[in-house]
């Protein structure tokens, strides 16, 4: 069987362009051969001009998604709605019966209704498309000798890419460096066990992807270790291309709220069709024109059935999510918007979320008891190390220098141009070395082996040899949590001598560590020696990570509103409690629990004590799962933050998984429901506030739409049963439907968030959106609209002859009622004057547009013919405005009564329940 060496994309401009190597062929070749074929420099990478040249040939590293259905087809598909088809049938029947005016009127109305529905659906799709672009994949790439953080779509064949734990592989890579590398290829091969990766060429195999152990495939996840690889295939030329096309066919599931709206719509449709059928039957029995009754009934079905409700819900949720982006929170899944308002427990990591994650070493304790203070902040060389009033530099003080050496060599971070590339804790140690002029030590050693840091073991170690002394034995350097590092130490350094580590010394170091921790410092221990288990303890460094600005205020606000906050950290008990107390999380009645204690507890026992626990210290991601389960067992809705690979399972288990945008791994971001762009705890509060506001807005337009639907249905039903002439014709009913489903309704979905909403207790997730209180308000509004409209119709019918003026007055009365009803629906608790008449500009424009449209329908001759209206006097309009404002006035009175009652209850000592009382 003949195997092609590579796939080559034709290009008339340049026949010598770099090929795209297949993963099968690349796995069989040596690294040098692959680099030669791709004309790549493994160490320095490509230069910018070469990248541009290759991109022009190969394109971006992304997939060509099949083109969307043309807009005209989407528009035509709107006519497939059964109700629209029935209206078209009535228009055809009107033509056959030579009632051309009616046919034209119905057709114009259909076009308007279909256009509004099309625009709504288009907005919904576009909003959801925008959401998918909020989290672009990124990677680390070497170009022109520098490590760069760039978008994955920028990669071209021949690029050198660096991988670390938690990264998603950005393109197909031929690996040339791999340290303890393990990759999860389940998204590609279906195999759940991570695959170990190597760099050696692989013999020709049967084409099985799993056998290509020197290839990292695009879209797979790095579970362990780190590596470097050369890009051999991008976009559709990667092995993931076909898988991606299949993924595109999957439809996103509907949110619970959308499902409930669908169910509500179906229930209303069922009842509406029943009532409309009765109206047709009664009208026919009373001798009314059957075609007229059919057209009115179908029009009423279009208006009364809130088919646009799920679409408006989607648009509101999507627009709300886009607003959250401005507040630095990316919500990946729409259901989370609903869940945010129910959240009553937040489990937050300390570092980078509650604190700034700007690590700076401020204190050093050597193993022989010497204390050193460190000045300066940030990832730079500005600052000094002071011992007993003297500035130490270089190897002036061996005890301090050995600590700095260990911290510098056992380190993967790089500081370039005052910019950190790596972990903040490691950056603090490099900055310390820079202050002493010892940062070059990192390059003086050749790393032979590495034991990467993990949240489980809480230490990192490297085995090295000095470049100038490679014939000497290897030396190990270790850094990590004191409790773990001290286990590997048998001796300690004392004034240049190596002495046996006694229990007395261990107790002394433990006391110093506790003292530094109680001052809010993160404490790291450092050691070195010939091998693990025979290390010499060198000392401790204290690293400060100050609380973020505004976090304390956010914590206070959330706790007051009934949201319990738990801090989860890998730090010591002293450090954790010191920071928690400073933030207002920890009080005299609070408890703290260690990760080890969580391990020994059953979920049942943990669920009993967890309400009083404010701090979980020395905790790792595996403990988070148990904490979540214990909280959920008590009925809590839990938000959990995370940034590491091991956090992914906990984030999926939480009701709201929150990933860190800056420090979070790709695995973590993928598992999360929400991403904090700036890793700031305050952003969680802003998201909860926005989530509550969005839910309130949905309630507002549900109230508006249902009250209008019920009023329209009731009005025609009563008129038919009372043997009145029809108060509204088909075109007028369709116009009302446009107002009900159109701009005024949608503008209620973008009402600015009430600043007081964050102080309200979390909503019970089991509560229906249609509460008793909301149903009462819907019915009150519907009754007022029906009674007012029937009164106007009866008043105009006193001559017992129905005229265009009669229906125009009735029609305009209903529309004006709708506008005032929309105004009162802007808030369920506050007066329209309190929230501001013009605070929602979109609402003002929507209502103004609707009123202008109504005036055109009344006064513009061509539209008068379509809607069968006639001009009204200014006195008529003033009369209607006075009457229809009653729906808003009554609503305001109800709100006032509710607020007064709530105030009385508060004064009586009634308190909202919260999870803290569970």
UniProtKB/Swiss-Prot annotation:
Membrane topology designation: Multi-pass membrane protein
Binding residues for Mg(2+): 643, 647
Compartment(s) where it occurs, according to its Swiss-Prot or TrEMBL record: Golgi apparatus, trans-Golgi network membrane; Golgi apparatus, Golgi stack membrane
Extracellular side: 96-99, 283-294, 723-727, 795-801, 863-875
Chain ranges passing through the membrane: 79-95, 100-121, 263-282, 295-316, 700-722, 728-751, 776-794, 802-827, 843-862, 876-892
Example of a GO biological process term: Golgi calcium ion transport
Tissue: Expressed in hippocampal neurons in the CA3 region of the Amon's horn (at protein level). Expressed in brain, heart, lung, stomach, liver, colon and mammary gland.
Cellular component per GO, a single term: Golgi cisterna membrane
Classification via InterPro entries: ATPase_P-typ_cation-transptr_C (IPR006068), ATPase_P-typ_cation-transptr_N (IPR004014), ATPase_P-typ_cyto_dom_N (IPR023299), ATPase_P-typ_P_site (IPR018303), ATPase_P-typ_TM_dom_sf (IPR023298), ATPase_P-typ_transduc_dom_A_sf (IPR008250), HAD-like_sf (IPR036412), HAD_sf (IPR023214)
Reaction equation(s) it catalyzes: Ca(2+)(in) + ATP + H2O = Ca(2+)(out) + ADP + phosphate + H(+); Mn(2+)(in) + ATP + H2O = Mn(2+)(out) + ADP + phosphate + H(+)
Record topology, Cytoplasmic segments: 1-78, 122-262, 317-699, 752-775, 828-842, 893-918
First-listed, main subcellular location of the protein, grouped into a coarse class: Golgi
Documented EC number(s): 7.2.2.10
Entries under SMART domains matching the protein: Cation_ATPase_N
NCBIfam families: ATPase-IIA2_Ca, ATPase_P-type
PANTHER family reported in the protein's UniProt record: CALCIUM-TRANSPORTING ATPASE
Record's function text: ATP-driven pump that supplies the Golgi apparatus with Ca(2+) and Mn(2+) ions, both essential cofactors for processing and trafficking of newly synthesized proteins in the secretory pathway. Within a catalytic cycle, acquires Ca(2+) or Mn(2+) ions on the cytoplasmic side of the membrane and delivers them to the lumenal side. The transfer of ions across the membrane is coupled to ATP hydrolysis and is associated with a transient phosphorylation that shifts the pump conformation from inward-facing to outward-facing state.
Family: Belongs to the cation transport ATPase (P-type) (TC 3.A.3) family. Type IIA subfamily.
Assembly notes: Monomer. Homodimer.
Name assigned to this protein: Calcium-transporting ATPase type 2C member 1
Originating organism: Mus musculus (Mouse)
Organism ancestry: Eukaryota, Metazoa, Chordata, Craniata, Vertebrata
